[in-house]
Swiss-Prot record:
HAMAP family: DNA_YbaB_EbfC (MF_00274). Pfam families: YbaB_DNA_bd (PF02575). The lineage of its organism: Bacteria, Bacillati, Cyanobacteriota, Cyanophyceae, Synechococcales. One of its GO terms (molecular function) is DNA binding. GO terms for cellular component: bacterial nucleoid; cytosol. Belongs to the YbaB/EbfC family. It is found in: Cytoplasm, Nucleoid. Binds to DNA and alters its conformation. May be involved in regulation of gene expression, nucleoid organization and DNA protection. This is Nucleoid-associated protein SynWH7803_0026. InterPro entries: YbaB-like_sf, YbaB/EbfC. Homodimer. It comes from Synechococcus sp. (strain WH7803).
Length: 113
């Protein structure tokens, strides 16, 4: 049968085994990312936001002095903290996915590249 260009049974079995292992590892990674708390802060550190490794918002902390500086200042600080947390969270996710896939370029949505 190998003469017809079909893979031998051993290769096919190995491919399925690897696919199952990647699926199990991906599930474990998903759980690890869900459990992570990644902090991002404004430049002055008066606004902080925590996201999971899957970019789910977890909590926000604002220094009381920030609230006395007006809405525009507070909003800018919160946005900066959110951007920082998002960048760190997506970088962590991308790094962990590369570890999982052994550096294969799978061109996954949301993973940039």
């Amino acid at each position: 049968m190998a003469g017809f260009g079909l893979p031998n049974f051993g290769q096919l079995t190995e491919a399925f085994r690897k696919a199952q292992q990647i699926q199990q590892d991906a599930q474990k990674l998903q759980e690890e990312l869900d459990a992570m708390e990644i902090e991002g802060s404004s430049e002055d550190g008066r606004a902080s936001i925590w996201l999971s490794g899957n970019q789910q918002p977890l909590r926000v902390k604002l220094d009381p002095s920030l609230l006395n500086e007006g809405q525009d200042t507070a909003e800018a600080a919160v946005l900066a903290a959110l951007q920082s947390a998002y960048e760190r969270s997506t970088a962590t996710m991308k790094e962990r996915m590369q570890d999982l896939t052994g550096g294969l370029d799978l061109n996954l949505p949301g993973m940039g590249g």
